[in-house]
Design a protein with these regions (language model features):
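Flexible "arm" and connector segments at domain edges
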Residues: 1-60, 64-90
Length: 90
């Protein structure tokens, strides 16, 4: 399960060096305003999907993907977020 997440994070990190015209992820990494807009949009769509009990998994995946890209673009490592969550378990 988490291997897929790790693979996604690695792909996002690799896309930093791609041409934004050829990679959607690279485009998001290079345009933080667009990425913030997408995260907001995807969260709204997830909430609507949960309320309608329809397409929840798809929308949740979109939120996770866009959030991971935004974190990476902002210099926030998912590993640091996971460490913070682990601290909160105590």
């Amino acid at each position: 399960m988490f291997k897929s997440l790790e693979e996604l994070v690695n792909i996002i990190r690799e896309r930093k060096n791609f041409n934004p015209q050829k990679s959607y992820t690279s485009k998001l990494l290079n345009d933080k305003n667009l990425n913030v807009t997408k995260v907001k949009e995807e969260v709204k769509e997830l909430i609507e999907a949960i309320q309608k009990n329809d397409n929840k998994i798809h929308e949740a995946a979109d939120v996770i993907y866009h959030l991971l890209v935004l974190l990476e673009a902002s210099g926030i490592k998912i590993e640091d977020v996971m460490d913070e969550l682990k601290k909160r378990q105590k």
